[in-house]
Amino acid sequence: MIYKLAARYPIQVIAIVGILVSMAYFSFLEALTQEDFPVLIRALKRFGILDGFPNTRLPNEMILKLSSVQGEDASVWEQIPAAELGGEGFVDFDITQWYYPANAKVDVAQLVEPYRNDCIFHDASGACHFFFKEVGNWTVSSIALPSNLANPPIDYFLDSSSTVIQRILPAIREHGISWSWLLQLIARTWMNTLKIASQASKTELLIVGTAYACMLISIVSLYLKMRRLGSKFWLFFSVLLSTLFSVQFAMTLVRASGVRISLVSLIESLPFLINVVALDKAAELTRQVITRCSVSDSHSPMHEDIAKACRNAAPPILRHFSFGIVVLAIFSYCNFGIKQFFLFAAVMIYDLLLLFSFFVAILTLKLEMRRYNAKDDVRKVLIEEGLSESTARHVADGNDSSATTSAGSRYFKVRYGTKIILFIFIAFNLFELCSIPFKHYAATSAAAARLIPLVRSQYPDFKSQRLLDDGVFDDVLSAISSMSNIESPSVRLLPAVFYGAELSSTSFLSTIHSFINNWSHYISASFLSKWIVCALSLSIAVNVFLLNAARLNSIKEEPEKKVVEKVVEVVKYIPSSNSSSIDDIQKDEIAQESVVRSLEECITLYNNGQISTLNDEEVVQLTLAKKIPLYALERVLKDVTRAVVIRRTVVSRSSRTKTLESSNCPVYHYDYSRVLNACCENVIGYMPLPLGVAGPLIIDGKPFYIPMATTEGALVASTMRGCKAINAGGGAVTVLTRDQMSRGPCVAFPNLTRAGRAKIWLDSPEGQEVMKKAFNSTSRFARLQHIKTALAGTRLFIRFCTSTGDAMGMNMISKGVEHALVVMSNDAGFDDMQVISVSGNYCTDKKPAAINWIDGRGKSVIAEAIIPGDAVKSVLKTTVEDLVKLNVDKNLIGSAMAGSVGGFNAHAANIVTAVYLATGQDPAQNVESSNCITLMDNVDGNLQLSVSMPSIEVGTIGGGTVLEPQGAMLDLLGVRGAHMTSPGDNSRQLARVVAAAVMAGELSLCSALASGHLVKSHIGLNRSALNTPAMDSSAKKPATDALKSVNSRVPGR
């Protein structure tokens, strides 16, 4: 399909459409020159541009006057200066001439058809009489036309042909067009519109007015839809541009078919054309494409995602356009007197083609740039979060490897495409230069079919004086002299219009030559030339953007040392039951590799910058001898994996047990470049955790698998059971009420008065605005929402509440807080303020605090589910009444008796921590993130369950999310990295998933407690043969029936 090509080769498609549109524009412009322009003519005349037209003084014109010869009964034509006329006399006749090849077999009557009713001399058939004269290889055809200098008839110009237009243009170039002329033209246009409207009936006005209103509503609706989809201007403009192109193509097709539609009729049809093409279809296509590209795997090529989205969106769009085209074609065929039906059908055909070609190509480039910008935003966020430039670039490229590659490849396609266009341009010019000797042959070919206007400068300069001397005008002057009803007429010889004979369409060179001539003619127009400059400027901007993408893509990480590859090939993971050890294998490999040099030799080589020549054992010696700092191995060796292996060996040999070097803690096959300057220091390996998955859990109508990294048996299974029960009721519904991360510095003042004044200023609108401006200037992503203050003696605690997009954002907030405090001290008059700490525990971070429970921190989410009573019995093995009673007694009363703050739940921290470890969140923040209150109610025999979590602190950028395993789990949830269209949506979605998962865990654990199955399930799922001593059969049976027997003796249980 065409959309696949447009998505894969967008730049080529745009270039091809641009060429075709330019050709259609030429045809459209040629058609406009044949239309009536009373408004334009009157506006030109108003400013003197057409004064005396066609008697406007033009170059090379001559004025002749018939005078009597003294003493003789005869008269002669004398040339007189134009100034002698003085505006009082008048010119009776204009002699207009056409020059064309002498042997061209054409019907020259077509040249003067517009002047059929104005000619002075007619032949027997009523057509204009020509006066012919051969001049070399050219034929001069002349006619006589009446003209009045004082009052040139405007109606004479309304049927203006290209001949008249060619004479208007020099006058316009000479006088210029000012702003006042444009205002006059607008005013004249408005007056002419009112005149046309006054001649129409009320029904016609109502129909056209309604159509224009609907058109404006459609355009505004399209703009608003594109705004909601994340495009402020360009996609909206592209849709309108595509529609304009379709109208141009349709007009060209209609005129080629012989159907003439006047300019006034086209203006009346414009709103119907806009309404016919259905702009909302373009918005729907855009929505589906953006949705597909937002939720798809970011590593898949962009053009594949767009092609799939277009394939899904195509059927309804094709049905709409097909129905409209068929109906309009039938009406056009039936010929009901409305010839615009043919135009409407043509517009719909071309609009459908351009929608899936030109617009899809524009949309592809837009999304390519958006994906690249998203990757660049990730890199900048990671830098603000404290990562180094190289690590941030590596992580951003790894998160979306296809973006840079695609943008880079797109740049190279642009580069080669530009070279091809430049080559074609040079070839056309060379062809133009080389074809000059053959133009005369082309113009005089016997196969010529019609005449076309030529550029006069390319042909011999025929001057009126020379033609007069050659007797070219003798016949026409004699005919004028013989007319009996005039005395002493004046005649003006106007400069001629040159025509060449067009060759037959079978000549390829003629076609190319004609195209070049037309192109050069129209390209010189001031309007088109300005658009070409704008297009070239836009092209340069796009090329610069893609050049930056290609440059970033060309930056490659330094390849790993060969010694690491050797070690990886030799060292394998060996189970603990094997008698061999990794240490023995490594020592054997080092011994085989080379002989260990003395410490003095190693120090000399190291000081001389030859560290790369040392083997691992020699580097270990240097490190043990304190010549290389343990933390600097990555920087010195330029090889992160080798540095980890050596550090592991050094630590093992320096420790008391000396077991680390030969332990089963893994070290190889891990991307430590993502860890360096990002997650951990002094790395000696990595710690695998069991990773399970619960679900799928339906959250807000979408299924999610919940990744959980934990070492606690029965936790994943319990959460899985809760997911099953929640899904039985239709899934979970979540509401996010707040999204704000906080940092609370502590500042001090000399006395309470100054501290109180600072608090009042910070709480005022002025103070809030100053601090917000200072804070927001430090980051492209962090935005200060509001400030809360608390005073304790002379110490002032300030809580900055900010939004941080998809990042958890603690580091970028700290940078903004520092700068805001500096501005407060230097510019707000609080130079006596002392900053005690950027974090004064008023945040509060990684500590239980009532302020997080009340005001929230991070994302505040409430999740709810309705579990049918039957599902409670069949899945959870308990009853609704028992669950509600247990929740009140345990989670509410029990936590209150313990004086808990935010701990009104069964085990929210269990689920939060497991999900945090799996998705790369900060595990320490489970302290405040686990704030949760679980509520249960019996509603018509069903269980209404909800969890409210006011301080879920999560992010999808930075921290542990840069690691590949954790990033893979974010990919599983579809929330990795920054959201393409709405920053912050990915982290907010992750918070919703956490809340829903906590609700599933709460439901399952409370059910196990209510039914007395907790101990039994843990014994069954939390005992493994590897770490549990053998038991006899009598000991394996849990004694949970004792609880049932106790409860059974209670009345009502």
From Swiss-Prot:
SUPFAM superfamilies: NAD-binding domain of HMG-CoA reductase, Substrate-binding domain of HMG-CoA reductase. The modification Phosphothreonine is found at residue 1028. The active site is at 712 (charge relay system), 846 (charge relay system), 922 (charge relay system), 1018 (proton donor). The modification Phosphoserine is found at residue 1024. It is found in: Endoplasmic reticulum membrane; Nucleus envelope. It catalyses: (R)-mevalonate + 2 NADP(+) + CoA = (3S)-3-hydroxy-3-methylglutaryl-CoA + 2 NADPH + 2 H(+). CoA binds at residues 718-724, 875-877, 1017-1018. One of its GO terms (molecular function) is sterol sensor activity. Residues 1-8, 225-232, 280-320, 363-417, 548-1053 are cytoplasmic. GO terms for biological process: coenzyme A metabolic process; ergosterol biosynthetic process; farnesyl diphosphate biosynthetic process, mevalonate pathway; isopentenyl diphosphate biosynthetic process, mevalonate pathway; isoprenoid biosynthetic process. It is a multi-pass membrane protein. Glycans are attached at residues 137, 518. NADP(+) binds at residues 779-781, 806-814, 1022-1023. Belongs to the HMG-CoA reductase family. This is 3-hydroxy-3-methylglutaryl-coenzyme A reductase. It comes from Schizosaccharomyces pombe (strain 972 / ATCC 24843).
